[in-house]
Amino acid sequence: MKVLILIIASVLLIGVECKDGFPVDSEGCILLPCATRAYCSVNCKFMKGSGGSCDTLACHCKGLPEDAKVQDKPTNKCGRK
């Protein structure tokens, strides 16, 4: 019983950090234009996210891995710093 409580407490304390945002390529260009909510959700899940939705003509993904490249806002810099 003590072991079970220890495991549950450990899981709650460790947590899992995830990113939310607009996925971008190496040039900083937004990857997924928004077609439908279902399209965004499927593509965000393909990128190992928990899901996605349409937001300002771009897909906004939720629950992406920490190493995913994202922008917080849907401004498309595309190669500009």
Curated annotation (Swiss-Prot):
Residues 1-18 form the signal peptide. This is Beta-toxin Ct13. Its main location: secreted. InterPro entries: LCN-type_CS_alpha_beta_dom, Scorpion_toxin-like_sf, Scorpion_toxinL/defensin. Disulfide bonds join 29-78, 34-54, 40-59, 44-61. It comes from Centruroides tecomanus. The keyword Membrane does not apply. It is found in: Secreted. Has the structural arrangement of an alpha-helix connected to antiparallel beta-sheets by disulfide bonds (CS-alpha/beta). Beta toxins bind voltage-independently at site-4 of sodium channels (Nav) and shift the voltage of activation toward more negative potentials thereby affecting sodium channel activation and promoting spontaneous and repetitive firing. GO terms for cellular component: extracellular region. One of its GO terms (molecular function) is sodium channel inhibitor activity. Keywords: Amidation, Disulfide bond, Ion channel impairing toxin, Neurotoxin, Secreted, Signal, Toxin, Voltage-gated sodium channel impairing toxin. Belongs to the long (4 C-C) scorpion toxin superfamily. Sodium channel inhibitor family. Beta subfamily. CDD domains: neurotoxins_LC_scorpion. PROSITE patterns: LCN_CSAB. The keyword Signal applies. Expressed by the venom gland. The modification Cysteine amide is found at residue 78.
